[in-house]
Design a protein with these regions (language model features):
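Ligand-site clamp/hinge motif
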Residues: 211, 239-285, 417-418, 430-432, ...
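Alpha-helical secondary-structure segments
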Residues: 52, 128-135, 165-171, 221-222, ...
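N-terminal lobe/hinge region of extracytoplasmic solute-binding protein
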Residues: 54-106, 137, 218-219
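Gly/Pro-rich hinge or "lid" segments in bacterial periplasmic/extracellular proteins
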Residues: 88, 187-245, 251, 372-373, ...
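Detector for C-terminal structural segments
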Residues: 37-40, 229, 302, 330-361, ...
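Short, low-complexity disordered leader/linker segments with a strong preference
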Residues: 1-50, 159, 373, 388, ...
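Surface-exposed binding/hinge segments that line
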Residues: 149-200
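Aromatic- and charge-enriched surface segment that lines or borders ligand/interaction sites
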Residues: 100-145, 163, 169-171, 263-269, ...
Length: 568
């Protein structure tokens, strides 16, 4: 039986990946493509070069699906390997990829995929249903070990079988509402390459590197890796035998930068064709460059996760939803959007992004109106009086809280923190900050009790289906993806029910109830929804089609590069 909960032994290994993986699909939720955006009416050059992308602060970790964990890794897999289906960037609907069509049984427990017959691996062997069945069964078999990082994509899967070369049948142990939305994210691997590595305990699955300097790389997507340098520049080249629409470009390069100034300079000098994500502070200057286009992509929620663990005892007042509500209405969200994100953000009010509406949830929760007077009134009513220093005292302790900031977003989040500090000082609450490389291990602690922190500024994304966004707040994710330690049995029960409800209307009602619980418990305080800002050379046309790429390397759609072209 598939499970999403990592074993105790693996949890701390997964913690380092958790926040990065949560960013996977933030851009997909708001629509990735857009067309236009710096395009010209000229004809594309007949000799298309490599499109060079610079990424600030983000890098790939591996091109082995059993080892990789960042969104950039999974974006590469979408371009390298077949997938059963994919999201359309135009309307976020699931559309065919390797599977031309699919059907499901009335009870939702059997899925049958009809695969196309013209797909081939780069070594000339055909892509068949056997490859898909092998991939799925291998992940299910080793989900508590070597394939744990892929296990979320096979939730509820019992077995996959190849009925014939182009017919795949997947049997589920129970109906899974988000099955199609998750299974397509699993890259289909060539059985003849990976089967020897899956022998025994599967430990050898982690040994393949997909480094062309060390081994033959076998893929079937529109691009293959030509040069692998995880800390520098990785280059992908076009696969001319790809079964789908052919990209115009010969390939694309992906270079990691730790310093935004170096990346921006490389763009200005012509060493790069595009750079993301740009610090909002530099966007005004770049907009003045005649050769560059600057645009925001996606809709990422920025929130405050307040410690909600019943094991946390230092500041028990934080467990009170009334205190959290007071904190929430003391915050000036519009100020954060305007001064920190320079127009590339808008105030947020719901723990789920409004793009889920109306298919999966009712109208999103309104943005909390700032009301400092009411916040002070609530805290006074709870008996938390201000001391001589202006800081309130609760349960014998000053209301001084440590807020964790993820180093990867240090520049923006430090400025967000400064505004939060100013806002909450108006209601007698003092904040301090601590920058950490990855806050989750520090938050959860070795025993996953969440004893040693007060709050954290969190940012993550979700897939168009809200299952994963809801999943992170379950009790089973304490010590893994759950940022606040929230543990509500009623919520967990609703999550399990919606996960197996294949009637859309009934599932929507369950999700509405879950959102009501999360909002009522003030599990997280939404601040803003922000965009990743990208700049690119205007000589390139249809760069906006790469919206998902700029939201961490597109993982939703293999056709993103199709119209990208350099103008004559």
């Amino acid at each position: 039986m598939s499970t999403r909960v990592p074993s105790t032994k693996r949890r701390h290994r997964l913690l380092g990946a958790a926040l990065v993986v949560l960013l996977l699909a933030a851009v997909a939720v708001s629509g990735c493509g857009g067309g236009g955006g710096g395009g010209q009416s000229a004809s594309p050059s007949a000799d298309q070069p490599v499109f060079r992308i610079g990424a600030i602060g983000f890098a790939m970790t591996s091109l082995n699906p059993f080892v990789a964990y960042t969104a950039m890794d999974y974006g590469a897999f979408m371009q390298m390997y077949p997938s059963l289906a994919q999201y359309s960037n135009a309307d976020l609907k699931v559309k065919p990829e390797l599977a031309e069509s699919w059907t499901t049984s009335a009870d939702g427990k059997t899925w049958t995929f009809k695969l196309r017959s013209d797909a081939v691996w780069t070594d000339g062997k055909p892509v068949t249903a056997n490859d898909a069945a092998f991939t799925i069964n291998t992940v299910v078999k080793f989900q508590k070990g070597p394939s744990a990082l892929l296990s979320t994509y096979v939730v509820g899967v019992k077995e996959a079988k190849a009925q014939d070369a182009t017919t795949l049948v997947v049997e589920l142990e129970r109906p899974v509402a988000a099955f199609l939305a998750t299974i397509f994210q699993l890259p289909i691997l060539p059985e003849h390459v990976w089967a020897p590595l899956a022998a025994g305990d599967g430990s050898k699955l982690a040994t393949l590197t997909n480094d062309p300097a060390k081994e033959t790389v076998v893929v079937a997507g529109p691009f293959t890796v030509q040069k692998l340098d995880l800390k520098g520049t990785t280059v992908f080249s076009r696969v001319d035998t790809f079964y789908g629409p052919k990209p115009l470009v010969k390939g694309f390069g992906y270079q990691t930068f730790a310093n935004p100034d170096a990346a921006v300079q490389a763009l200005k000098s012509g060493q790069l064709d595009a750079v993301y994500p740009l610090p909002p502070a530099v966007t005004d200057t770049l907009k003045q460059e005649a050769t560059l286009e600057v645009q925001g992509f996606g809709d990422m929620p920025l929130q405050i996760a307040v410690n909600d663990s019943p094991d946390y005892t230092k500041h028990p007042e934080l467990l009170d939803p009334k205190v959290r509500e007071a904190i929430s209405i003391a915050i000036d969200r519009q100020q954060i959007a305007d001064s920190v994100y320079r127009g590339y953000a808008k105030p947020g009010g719901s723990v789920l992004l409004p793009q889920f509406s109306p298919e999966f949830m009712s109208a999103p929760v309104a943005v909390p109106a700032r009301d400092v007077a009411k916040a002070n009134e609530v805290l006074e009513g709870l008996g938390y009086k201000k001391g001589s220093d202006g800081i309130r005292v609760a349960n014998g302790r000053p209301m001084k809280y440590m807020v964790l900031i993820w180093s990867i977003f240090r520049a923006e989040h430090a400025r967000v923190f400064d505004l939060l500090k100013q806002n909450l000082a108006e209601v007698g609450i003092s904040l301090e900050s601590k920058v950490v490389d990855n806050p989750l291990p520090l938050m959860a602690g070795k025993d996953a009790k969440y004893r040693d922190f007060e709050a954290e500024i969190v940012v993550y994304g979700v897939t168009p289906d809200p299952d994963f966004s809801l999943f992170i707040f379950t009790g089973g994710m304490r010590g893994a993806y759950n940022p606040s330690g929230y543990n509500n049995p009623e919520y967990d029960k609703l999550y399990a029910q919606q996960g197996g409800e294949i009637d859309p209307a009934k599932r929507k009602a369950l999700i509405d109830n879950m959102v009501t619980l999360l909002q009522g418990d003030q599990v997280e305080m939404p601040l803003v929804s922000w965009q990743m800002v990208t700049a690119w050379n205007k000589q390139w046309q249809n760069v906006a089609d790469l919206g998902c790429v700029f939201g961490f390397f597109g993982y939703t759609d293999k056709t993103e590069f199709n119209r990208l072209a350099l103008m004559k």
